[in-house]
Structure formats: structure tokens, C-alpha cells
């Protein structure tokens, strides 16, 4: 794979999760542009830099040991990528502190480097949180490939930080630089909430949660067909989002044990808050993780999953396929994976390669609900 070569370092970086013969690299021209811009400003070694939404550590690893760097974002996979790429390049895995998006930063920062996220609500929440964390003379520099840089990103920076200057394009990337100006302290519009009729739930959704304004149509199709009579089964909601699948299932299965897993810290935070609101102090596990990668083999009876079909701006079924493999490893013999998916994705044939029995539980014109038994 190509090396990331910048004025700061030459790095060998990998994506997370790792895939054999992965054609995609772990950095892009926007990373290079951000690092070149920062280097041109010649900050001293005491400069505190906050890096936001660094996909696999390209920015933070480049600056580690040279400036006072803190990394933050909503992706546990990005956090794993940062740790792996630090050690891969001769640094200790904890040499750059990481702050999950469900937590808050400490202190003031002189520079903030931002990779513009796919979800602008996350960017807005981060810009609002920056108020009170920017040192005098600080700059916020956001970077993205032009095809992934909406006009609204600059508007949000102008609204919450200060005047914005757009750079010239370079290798199809562009930077937006905001200089701190006096702005009224903003109140965050997040988390958002919506009401569900069946079951009757009020659901909290932090800024980066998928379909935070309302129930997605795949989950809506899945809910009436969740498994019943689970007894004391051990159940995982894999890619739990705001936790609605696990919560709806738990309401009908009072003796089952639940684990809610997502790679988004804000999703896990939302799921935990929603569980408490719906089920009080009933025990459950809430985990930000790389799916079921750390779960003991043959330790689950049921897995519920509405698999994602993209990682940031990359679309494909590689994450779903990986989740299916993880579910197979974690399930006991005779255990079952229940999923919902778009018809055109062909999940039935993919599951048949991993499980001894696959059946269609229900279908709509757009979705299928499948049960795969190990």
C-alpha cells in the first residue's frame, strides 16, 4: 500500500477493519492538505491540537510526538485504527489520547483539524462543543474531498466559530479555515427525540445516530417479526443504533439477557439512555466495539441485526458480511441470527454460505427478514 508522506512523517497506515487485498488506502488528499497547511503555519511543540473524525489516524499519528495532540470522534473502529497505526509506526498505542464523542474534551486548543463527517449533525455538535475550548488566536481547519464537502459545512463553521476562508482545490481536496470570533454561546439541538407507537417508546438520538429524526424503514419492517418466547436466552443487538430492536425484544422477553453493541459511541450512549427510560434498572450490557469481535465463541443464543451498508463515504456489504461471520462465531450450535436487509443485497445467499439453515421470516416490497440457524 502507498505510504503517507508529509512534512511531518512517512507513515505506513492500514484501514480498520482490516481486509485482505483491500484496494482502499487509509488516507486521502484531504489528510495531506491538512497536514501541509498546519506545517506551513510552523506551530511550536507546545501547540495543542485537537483532531476530529480522523478515520484511521493519518492526522494524529503524523503529529504524535511533535505537537500536543488529542484525537476525538464517534467511531470505535477509527479509535482501533489509531491505536494500530501508532504501534505500526513505532509509537506506543496510547501516545495520542482519544476522547469518544460521548465524552467531553478538557482544556484549550490552539488548532483544531477536522475531517468533515458524513453526518453534518455530528459536525454541528462538535462545533458547538468547541465553544469554550478554543485558545486566543485559535483556528479551526476542516478538510474533505470536494465531492464530500457540502456548502453547509462552511455555513456551520461560520455560525459557531467565526469567518471562514475556503482554500484553493488541491488534488480534489479543499480546506475551510475558521478564525475564532466572538459568537453567542449556542445551545445544542441534540439529542433529538421521536415517538414510536408500537411499542410505545420515546427514543433519544444523539447527533451521529443513524436516522435520528425517525425510525428507519428497515427497522420498521423488522419490529413486528422479532423472535418471541426467548426464555432466558442471551441476545445481542449487533449494530444497535439507538437500541430500539433490543428494547422492543426485551419488552416481550422479560427473562432474556441483552447486549447492545455498536461501533458508534453516540449510538451506544443513545441505546443506554433509551433502555433506562423503557426498562428502568433491568440489567443489560452496552458496548462500543468492533461488532462481536471480542465476544466469547458460542456465548450467544440469538443475534438481532440491521446491518449497515456503508463506512463513512464507502458503500458496500463488507461490514454486513463481517457481522454475519462474527455472529456465526458467537452463536451456540442451534442459535439464530435474525436480520433485515434490502431485497437487492442478496443476503439470503450470503448467509447460506455460513449457516446450516436460512429461512425467510417475512418480506415487504423492499425488505426481507431472514433467520439463519447455526
UniProtKB/Swiss-Prot annotation:
Chief location bin: cytoplasm
InterPro entries assigned to the protein according to its UniProt record, in alphabetical order: DNA_methylase_N6_adenine_CS, rRNA_m2G-MeTrfase_RlmG, RsmC/RlmG, SAM-dependent_MTases_sf, Small_mtfrase_dom
Class of enzymatic activity (EC top level): transferase
EC numbers on record: 2.1.1.174
The keyword Transcription appears for this protein: no
GO molecular function terms attached to this record: 23S rRNA (guanine(1835)-N(2))-methyltransferase activity; nucleic acid binding
Cellular component aspect of the GO annotation: cytoplasm
Function according to Swiss-Prot or TrEMBL: Specifically methylates the guanine in position 1835 (m2G1835) of 23S rRNA.
PANTHER family, per database record: RIBOSOMAL RNA LARGE SUBUNIT METHYLTRANSFERASE G, RIBOSOMAL RNA SMALL SUBUNIT METHYLTRANSFERASE C
Family statement drawn from the similarity comment of this UniProt entry: Belongs to the methyltransferase superfamily. RlmG family.
Name of the molecule in the record: Ribosomal RNA large subunit methyltransferase G
Species, as recorded: Pseudomonas putida (strain GB-1)
Amino acid at each position: 500500500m502507498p505510504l503517507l508522506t508529509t512534512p511531518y512523517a512517512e507513515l505506513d497506515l492500514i484501514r480498520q477493519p482490516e481486509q485482505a487485498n483491500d484496494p482502499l488506502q487509509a488516507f486521502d488528499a484531504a489528510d495531506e492538505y491538512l497536514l501541509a497547511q498546519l506545517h506551513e503555519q510552523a506551530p511550536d511543540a507546545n501547540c495543542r491540537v485537537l483532531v476530529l473524525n480522523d478515520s484511521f489516524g493519518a492526522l494524529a499519528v503524523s503529529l504524535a510526538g511533535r505537537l500536543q495532540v488529542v484525537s476525538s470522534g464517534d467511531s470505535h473502529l477509527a479509535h482501533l485504527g489509531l491505536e494500530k497505526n501508532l504501534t505500526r509506526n513505532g509509537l506506543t498505542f496510547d501516545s495520542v489520547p482519544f476522547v469518544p464523542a460521548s465524552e467531553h474534551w478538557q482544556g484549550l486548543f490552539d488548532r483544531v483539524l477536522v475531517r468533515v463527517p458524513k453526518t453534518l449533525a455530528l459536525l454541528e455538535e462538535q462545533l458547538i462543543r468547541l465553544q469554550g475550548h478554543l485558545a486566543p488566536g485559535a483556528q479551526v481547519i476542516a478538510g474533505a474531498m470536494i465531492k464530500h464537502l457540502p456548502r453547509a459545512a462552511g455555513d456551520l463553521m461560520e455560525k459557531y466559530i467565526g469567518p471562514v476562508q475556503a482554500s484553493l482545490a488541491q488534488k480534489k481536496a479543499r480546506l475551510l479555515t475558521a478564525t475564532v470570533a466572538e459568537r453567542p454561546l449556542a445551545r445544542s439541538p441534540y439529542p433529538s427525540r421521536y415517538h414510536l407507537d408500537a411499542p410505545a417508546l420515546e427514543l433519544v438520538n444523539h447527533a451521529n445516530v443513524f436516522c435520528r429524526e425517525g425510525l428507519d424503514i428497515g427497522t420498521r419492517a423488522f419490529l413486528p417479526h422479532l423472535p418471541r418466547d426467548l426464555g432466558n436466552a442471551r441476545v445481542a443487538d449487533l449494530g444497535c443504533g439507538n437500541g430500539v430492536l433490543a428494547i422492543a425484544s426485551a419488552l416481550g422477553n422479560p427473562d432474556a439477557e441483552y447486549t447492545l453493541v455498536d461501533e458508534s459511541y453516540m449510538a451506544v450512549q443513545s441505546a443506554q439512555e433509551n433502555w433506562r427510560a423503557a426498562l428502568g434498572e433491568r440489567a443489560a450490557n452496552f458496548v462500543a466495539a468492533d461488532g462481536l469481535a471480542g465476544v466469547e465463541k458460542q456465548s450467544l443464543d440469538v443475534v438481532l441485526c440491521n446491518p449497515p451498508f456503508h463506512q463513512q463515504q464507502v458503500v458496500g456489504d463488507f461490514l454486513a458480511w463481517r457481522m454475519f461471520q462474527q455472529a456465526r462465531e458467537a452463536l451456540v450450535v442451534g442459535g439464530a441470527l435474525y436480520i433485515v436487509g434490502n431485497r437487492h443485497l442478496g443476503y439470503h445467499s450470503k448467509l447460506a454460505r455460513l449457516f446450516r439453515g436460512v429461512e425467510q421470516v417475512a418480506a415487504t416490497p423492499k425488505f426481507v427478514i431472514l433467520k439463519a440457524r447455526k
